[in-house]
């Protein structure tokens, strides 16, 4: 008997065994609480899930802390609080996985909710063990003050952009400070409505695979993969629909601040000194570059901007130490997961980096090749659950039909270089494909020459980076290279979306140059300064720039040059003081330019677009009776995808994932179409009825564009009904398979559609009214074969 007791005691000494026991008990608390809440109360699945998980978290903290990992028995109050906050924080991530996973299995895969809850526990158990073991109850964990002291440069690099964004919110009256928003251009017309539909699915436990609220019914997984896959986006469930724009602005601001932190991490690794004060201005310059200011309204792109420094840090670690591949794999996985489009550009950049890396010998090169390929494939495989559906969906879009452009130049290369100078207005959208956002600080330009002449930096590193910036500059100005960088896709009004790669290299070169300054480098510094001033003189002759920009650049060059020379001459506290002064000067330039950039960009006043949202929603709700098998639309939208914002089963879709075949079909039915859109504009009685559009909502100050029957007015919004609207599904003749939408005349196309569907011909007929008149010996008669009028026959004959 004692022998069995001893075996049990010995077994219980194993941490994994104790974790399984505690995990089983925690799971029991979770499951029992969930089942009881669902059976006894009227709580929704997600609400019951969250309450059950919170109860399980409280139980798990004590079970893990005092039984499984057996952390110190006597702890200070501060240690307990820190440990508890850390534990809960990590478990909240697992809670998101559990809630979303349970809903996904229930609503998308149609599993029973209790079975779904049990299945997802396996995933949660693994996540919780890793977090608890590696982060929360780590035995050699440093005190908080030591962690802050070791990483204060990274923390400051986060705080400065965060403070800047907070001040911007206040001054520009963003969100709660006045209703303005950073969600401009497509972010207003596409992303906000898509986030509204995503919000509706998360809150109301809808399917994440398909939605009826976008473009007559769309593959929601495609849309999530392109626009909303970032895990941070789950915070939208904490906001109401009318405040989703605030959530999006918050996400943009958080990602900008995180970009500064990740860049600081990379630069600290680059020169093996993460506490160098000079890291801060370069990290902040990355976070507040013109690219970020101009394009941050593409909040899904910002995930790749913030993760790029960590991808490169992991890549360089892996090339130096083949055993260290985790950071590269996980960060690349994050980039591919959050936005495969921008991450494609990062992948091209990584291939160029790998090709230009010094692999020392053929054996090391072979090992590096296998390691680079293997870890990259691993990252892609981890995100394949989104990448594969996204790829299949992309092959149905207009961009799938690739037509390679000729090798041509957009313009002078000096027009590109001009965008590197201070006070350059950031581009937020532009029809000219040669525009580019390159500004990231005047000091970055000055340090190019100093970098090249620095003898402490390896020559092949210099050659690699110079080749990359020259190639990227060529790509900005070349139609074919530009097309390839953009994923074999045209730019559509947002030019050179990969210019953040140029900014990243430029800033990393600049920091490496300034971090390696000493007395021995003074001749190289002086030569680099001479080259920089020579470049400025030559640029002044070739670029049409405002004199204020030229004068300010001269002044900044002079000030920075003096500071860098002094930095190379002094040591100890004197060097720290000079570095502090230089950092403040550089930060002043960056922050001032960022403020001017946001002033130039402006903001969107949300009430101008959604000020009557409550009234429109009331009108929509007045005709809703559960799940209804018909569609509704807005007479005249203020936002392109406005029907999606209201979770209407509408027609319109403006987005990058739109099907090319559907665009062509909608064009044939008379609707307005573009390369990546089809809208309700252009609807006629036949097309409206065929698509099952039963109700139309019109704001009273708008012209009524369609022939429908007035029903009611709800809170200032008129409701119209189309009594001839068909169901969403109906039978047609087999001949419809032969219908093509390429007729030059939409009436001919519609006639052909109806005839092939029903056998009824002549839905629309040509009318040639007699037009005659005379005045001053001039006689007017209708004799123009190109002037055609079409009349609609009785649609009931359908």
Where are the model-predicted features located?
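Start-transfer (signal-anchor) and selected internal transmembrane alpha helices
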Residues: 1-3, 8, 142-174, 371, ...
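Membrane-interface junctions at the ends of membrane-embedded or membrane-associated helices
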Residues: 142-148, 270-272, 316-326, 355-370, ...
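Membrane-interface coil-to-helix junctions
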Residues: 161-263, 284-305, 394-398, 407-432, ...
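Periplasmic/ER-lumenal interhelical loops and adjacent helix-loop junctions
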Residues: 185, 190, 196-200, 231, ...
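Membrane-interface micro-motifs in multi-pass membrane enzymes
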Residues: 221-226, 246-258, 278, 285-309, ...
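Soluble catalytic regions of membrane-associated enzymes that act on cell-envelope
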Residues: 238, 547, 577-798
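Membrane-embedded helix bundles of polyisoprenyl
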Residues: 253-270, 275-360, 371-396, 532-537
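Contiguous transmembrane helix-bundle modules in multi-pass membrane proteins
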Residues: 342, 463-480, 489-615
């Amino acid at each position: 008997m004692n022998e069995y007791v001893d075996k049990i005691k010995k077994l219980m000494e194993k941490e994994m065994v104790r974790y399984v026991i505690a995990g089983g008990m925690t799971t029991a608390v979770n499951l029992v609480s969930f089942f009881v809440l669902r059976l006894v109360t009227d709580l929704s699945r997600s609400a019951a899930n969250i309450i059950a998980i919170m109860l399980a978290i409280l139980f798990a903290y004590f079970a893990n802390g005092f039984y499984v990992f057996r952390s110190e028995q006597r702890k200070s109050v501060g240690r307990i609080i820190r440990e508890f906050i850390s534990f809960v924080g990590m478990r909240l991530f697992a809670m998101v996985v559990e809630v979303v996973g349970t809903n996904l299995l229930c609503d998308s895969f149609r599993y029973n909710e209790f079975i779904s809850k049990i299945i997802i526990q396996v995933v949660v158990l693994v996540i919780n063990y890793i977090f608890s073991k590696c982060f929360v109850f780590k035995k050699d964990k440093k005190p908080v003050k030591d962690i802050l002291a070791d990483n204060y440069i990274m923390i400051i690099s986060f705080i400065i952009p965060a403070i800047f964004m907070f001040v911007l919110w206040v001054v520009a009256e963003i969100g709660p400070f006045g209703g303005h928003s950073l969600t401009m251009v497509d972010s207003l017309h596409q992303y906000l409505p898509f986030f509204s539909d995503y919000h509706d699915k998360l809150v109301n436990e809808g399917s994440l695979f398909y939605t009826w609220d976008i473009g007559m019914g769309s593959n929601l997984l495609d849309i999530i993969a392109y626009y909303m896959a970032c895990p941070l986006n789950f915070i939208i469930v904490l906001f109401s629909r009318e405040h989703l724009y605030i959530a999006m602005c918050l996400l943009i601001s958080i990602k900008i601040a995180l970009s500064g932190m990740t860049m600081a991490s990379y630069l600290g690794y680059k020169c093996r000194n993460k506490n160098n004060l000079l890291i801060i201005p370069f990290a902040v310059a990355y976070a507040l570059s013109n690219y970020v200011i101009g394009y941050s309204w593409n909040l899904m792109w910002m995930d790749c901007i913030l993760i790029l420094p960590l991808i490169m840090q992991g890549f360089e670690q892996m090339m130096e130490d083949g055993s260290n591949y985790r950071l590269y794999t996980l960060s690349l996985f994050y980039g591919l997961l959050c936005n495969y489009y921008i991450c494609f550009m990062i992948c091209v950049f990584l291939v160029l980096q790998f090709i230009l890396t010094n692999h020392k010998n053929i054996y090391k090169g072979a090992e590096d090749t296998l390691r680079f390929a293997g870890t990259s494939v691993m990252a892609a495989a981890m995100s394949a659950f989104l990448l594969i559906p996204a790829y299949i969906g992309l092959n149905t879009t207009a961009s799938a039909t690739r037509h390679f452009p000729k090798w041509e130049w957009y313009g002078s290369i000096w027009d590109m270089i001009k965008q590197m100078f201070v006070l350059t207005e950031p581009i937020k959208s532009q029809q000219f494909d040669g525009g580019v956002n390159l500004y990231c600080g005047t000091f970055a330009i000055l340090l190019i020459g100093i970098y090249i002449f620095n003898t402490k930096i390896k020559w092949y590193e210099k050659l690699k980076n110079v080749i990359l910036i020259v190639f990227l500059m060529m790509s900005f100005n070349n139609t074919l290279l530009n097309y390839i960088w953009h994923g074999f896709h045209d730019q559509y009004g947002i030019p050179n979306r990969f210019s953040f790669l140029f900014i990243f290299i430029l800033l990393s070169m600049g920091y490496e140059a300034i971090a390696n300054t000493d007395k021995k480098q003074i001749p190289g510094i002086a030569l680099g300064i001479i080259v920089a001033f020579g470049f400025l003189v030559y640029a002044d002759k070739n670029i049409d720039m405002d004199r204020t920009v030229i004068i300010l650049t001269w002044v900044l060059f002079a000030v920075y040059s003096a500071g860098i020379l002094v930095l190379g001459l002094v040591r100890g506290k004197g060097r720290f003081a000079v570095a502090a002064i230089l950092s403040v000067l550089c930060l002043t330039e960056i922050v001032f330019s960022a403020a001017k950039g946001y002033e130039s960009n402006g903001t969107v006043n949300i009430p101008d677009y959604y000020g009557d949202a409550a009234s429109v929603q009331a009108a929509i709700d007045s005709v809703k009776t559960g799940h209804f098998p018909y569609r509704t639309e807005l007479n005249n939208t203020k936002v392109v995808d406005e029907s999606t914002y209201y979770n209407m089963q509408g027609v319109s879709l403006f987005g990058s994932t739109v099907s090319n075949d559907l665009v062509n079909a909608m064009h044939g039915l008379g609707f307005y179409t573009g390369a990546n859109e089809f809208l309700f504009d252009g609807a006629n009685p036949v097309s409206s009825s065929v698509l099952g559009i039963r109700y139309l909502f019109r704001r009273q100050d708008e012209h009524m564009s369609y022939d429908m029957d007035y029903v009611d007015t709800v809170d200032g919004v008129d409701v119209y009904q189309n009594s001839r609207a068909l169901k969403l599904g109906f039978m047609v003749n087999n001949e419809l398979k032969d219908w093509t939408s390429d007729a030059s005349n939409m009436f001919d196309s519609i006639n052909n559609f109806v005839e092939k569907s029903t056998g009824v011909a002549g839905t629309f007929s040509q009318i040639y009214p007699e037009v005659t008149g005379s005045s001053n010996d001039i006689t007017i008669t209708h004799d123009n074969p190109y002037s055609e009028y079409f009349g609609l026959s009785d649609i009931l004959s359908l």
